[in-house]
């Protein structure tokens, strides 16, 4: 059914899978937005439009607390030549909450996360990237129906769960057929019928484990094993059945999401994906970090074991990651990190418009600041030129003169 499928795990994978897909688009991109403030993804979309890619974006008008920001996003995207619409049926009672992107009718993404700096760097979230004309076509069919405000008939044979059309029935069937285990990551597990079914399965001897937030634990029946995710804010919506099938997407297991909102999830049974998901679930359940090739691991590998910098990098810190090359990562250590064209800088940018000693980053007790060193062409944070010292936070986008962009990440 598909040529290739990949799992996106946040925090960790950041914007890279999304930007790579946007950058290789030739003809068309369809995207739904509930919330979005990531400047790298926004810039990639604008650049794709400038090279002739047809882009359509459905932007929610009912995202709580984001109404003004989404209106501004819609206006800016329209000015950039991107076709935008607000779903005609979007309302506070029946929000269009689904999170998807298709590229060139061959590649599709289904996300649990919004492309915001918070979701990309501070929340436990997942996404599925799949190369499948059939699945991309079915998602595009849904998108077109919502774009034109037309009825949609879901294909029950598809691996997609579409609310409010067939998600409840498909999810109920999957849970009912569980034989060995049910694992759920969902901070809004509230639907009475789903909870009752989970209790029934638990009483039949099938372990049911739920990862959620602290407030949720007191509301679930005792038959359901519960733990709160301590390390991140849990925003994922993921159900793993018998360790071999997973449902990932925008849909919480609550009545609004199942029966009223527009939601989209996908069923996955790929062995490698399930191994990754099970490992992440166990690490969050046990409150320990999984073994992975994350940013910290890659920085440590850049040093020989005997090198003293390796021990220093093992402690929490920051890195600058290049947008153009995800493997180009500059560690920001305690003290001063200098940036410029001269070879003696800690971060060397070979761009003639970058000053020899352009800027410096200071890290002191977890507080990170950027200072422009009276450069000729300026230092920029999230597109705005800075003067003097600027406090930084993870997720900020840094640019020096007209150089490539760097994202600041915490590790």
Where are these regions (language model features)?
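HKD-type phospholipase D/PLD-like phosphodiesterase module
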Residues: 1-26, 32-176, 191-245, 249-273, ...
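Short alpha-helix capping/helix-loop boundary micro-motifs
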Residues: 15, 168, 346-347, 382-387
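Buried hydrophobic-core signal for structured, non-transmembrane domains
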Residues: 29, 359-361
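Short, surface-exposed secondary-structure edge patches
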Residues: 99, 237, 351, 387-390
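A general beta-strand register signal
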Residues: 102, 109, 240, 247, ...
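Structural motif
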Residues: 103-104, 241-242, 333, 355, ...
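Intrinsically disordered, low-complexity acidic Ser/Thr-rich regulatory segments
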Residues: 297-352, 362, 397, 402, ...
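C-terminal boundary/linker segments immediately following FHA domains
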Residues: 363, 369-371, 376, 380-411
């Amino acid at each position: 059914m598909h040529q290739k499928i990949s799992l996106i795990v946040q925090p960790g994978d950041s914007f890279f899978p999304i930007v790579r897909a946007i950058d290789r688009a030739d003809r068309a991109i369809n995207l739904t937005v509930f919330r979005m403030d990531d400047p790298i993804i926004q810039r990639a979309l604008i650049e794709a439009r400038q090279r002739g890619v047809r882009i359509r974006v459905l932007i929610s008008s009912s995202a709580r607390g984001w109404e003004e920001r989404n209106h501004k996003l819609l206006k800016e995207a329209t000015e950039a030549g991107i076709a935008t619409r607000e779903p005609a049926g979007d309302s506070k009672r029946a929000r269009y909450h689904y999170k998807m992107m298709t590229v060139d009718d061959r590649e599709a993404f289904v996300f649990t996360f919004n492309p915001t700096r918070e979701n990309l760097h501070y929340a436990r979230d997942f996404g599925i990237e799949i190369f499948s004309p059939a699945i991309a076509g079915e998602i595009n069919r849904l998108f077109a129906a919502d774009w034109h405000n037309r009825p949609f008939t879901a294909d029950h044979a598809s691996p997609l769960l579409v609310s409010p059309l067939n998600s409840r029935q498909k999810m109920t069937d999957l849970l009912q057929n569980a034989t060995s285990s049910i694992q759920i990551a969902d901070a809004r597990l509230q639907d009475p019928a789903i909870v009752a079914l989970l209790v029934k399965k638990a009483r039949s001897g099938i372990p049911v484990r739920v990862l959620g937030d602290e407030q949720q634990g007191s509301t679930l029946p005792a038959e359901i094993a519960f733990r709160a995710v301590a390390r991140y804010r849990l925003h994922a919506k993921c159900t793993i059945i018998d360790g071999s099938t997973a449902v990932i997407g925008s849909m919480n297991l609550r009545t609004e999401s199942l029966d009223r909102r527009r939601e989209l999830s996908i069923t996955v049974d790929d062995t490698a994906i399930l191994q990754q998901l099970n490992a992440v679930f166990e690490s969050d359940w046990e409150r320990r970090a999984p073994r992975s090739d994350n940013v910290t691991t890659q920085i440590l590998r850049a040093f020989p074991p005997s090198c003293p910098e390796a021990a220093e990098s093992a402690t929490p810190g920051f890195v600058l990651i290049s947008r153009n090359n995800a493997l180009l990562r500059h560690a920001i250590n305690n003290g001063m990190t200098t940036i410029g064209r001269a070879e003696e800088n800690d971060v060397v940018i070979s761009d003639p418009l970058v000053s020899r000693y352009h800027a410096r980053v200071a890290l002191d007790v977890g507080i990170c600041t950027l200072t422009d060193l009276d450069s000729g062409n300026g230092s920029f944070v999230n597109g705005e030129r800075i003067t003097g010292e600027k406090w930084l936070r993870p997720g900020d986008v840094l640019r020096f003169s007209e150089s490539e962009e760097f994202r600041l990440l915490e590790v």
